[in-house]
Amino acid sequence: MDQLANHFKSHIAELNHRVAEIISRENLSGLVIHSGQPHRQFLDDMDYPFKVNPHFKAWLPILDNPHCWLLVNGRDKPQLIFYRPVDFWHKVADLPDAFWAEHVEIKLLTKADKVAELLPSDISQWAYIGEHLDVAEVLGFKTRNPDAVMSYLHYHRASKTQYELCCLRNANEIAVKGHLAAKNAFFNGGSEFEIQQEYLTATNQGENEVPYGNIVALNENAAILHYTKLESVRPESRHSFLIDAGANFFGYASDITRTYAFEKNIFSELIEAMDKMQQEIISMMRPGVKYVDLHIATHQKLAKILVDFDIASGEPQSLVDQGITNVFFPHGLGHMLGLQVHDMGGFLHDERGTHIAAPDAHPFLRCTRTLAANQVLTIEPGIYIIDSLLNELKQDSRKKQVNWQTVDLLRPFGGIRIEDNVIVHADQNENMTRDCGLN
């Protein structure tokens, strides 16, 4: 925690610098960042789990307290309007006394609808940053989530401060504990639901605290890219296990995937080949490299694996050009990682918000940035037996290049994905996931 405290001052200074720059350009007095407010379930008296505005938690690790506000102008000490009602129904947030509290001026808000009394008397030149535009309108904000401000902040969010890198390392360390527990639960015969519980216990995080819904998939369920059902019944046969699960630390996310074979067989050999390929792609990461080029290189390497394992036949580059590799690897190589699992700014190529879309041949790629120091990205190649995509391929001449016997052999295993979280440094890569002991 001492290391975080030491880095926090410079983190706030960097955020202040960014705000000062953009509000000067846009002739604004400052930004009013809303933590958010609860969403009530339809026809009920309960709220959905609260998720804080990522722009708010960029400044302060306050994740579970709605109706808070942050006033920043890049010059003065940030002002935190901290919601602390009189409430005998719910737990009221404690007064802030963590290491970060000395870096903000704190005002207490006891009634959410009285916040106007604590806002600047003239907010005509202040911009509201948040989800609840109706609230902003009632309060009199004329400028709400202006495009120029949002693009600027999202573009620069890709460059992580030392405080943020520390948070991301901690998020990886926590998640690795969960992954090791989940692996053990798989080999001990656990159901998907039981494996999930072991993961959550090891990370000491509830399902509403982890940054996304964990994917815990046994056997053919591993072919479903965003599988979150969690079967409670143990399968009769145990072939494979894919887990895509992260952890949260101070609002920063880890996002890690591993795949395991229950026995030594062609699938376990395929996992080894995919792991080797993933490490080769990570070794190619450096400032100045385009993420799109890494994605294309992954398809070229995957094509060779398809041939080596007699899943497909032909020249590897031809398999890429014909879109055959897309059938087995339909998603993107990865994405930016930070305050959000799919962090903002992956398509922005300047601070004005110039958008460069994914290539037409790879529409699901979530990042087209050129790599730079202090960026954090995931690298997550995969190979899957997805019947809906294979059925489309069967409708044309490409079907002759697929060995359907091998496909049938692999179908019960579902698929493979291996995902690490990597920091790009000026002269090296830092694989946080592997450094935390998950191989």
Swiss-Prot record:
GO terms for molecular function: aminopeptidase activity; metal ion binding; metalloexopeptidase activity; phosphoric triester hydrolase activity; proline dipeptidase activity. It catalyses: Xaa-L-Pro dipeptide + H2O = an L-alpha-amino acid + L-proline. Gene3D superfamilies: Creatinase/methionine aminopeptidase superfamily (3.90.230.10), Creatinase/prolidase N-terminal domain (3.40.350.10). GO terms for biological process: proteolysis. Its cofactor is Mn(2+). Its EC number is 3.4.13.9. Mn(2+) 2 binds at residues 244, 255, 419. This is Xaa-Pro dipeptidase. The lineage of its organism: Bacteria, Pseudomonadati, Pseudomonadota, Gammaproteobacteria, Alteromonadales. The gene is pepQ.
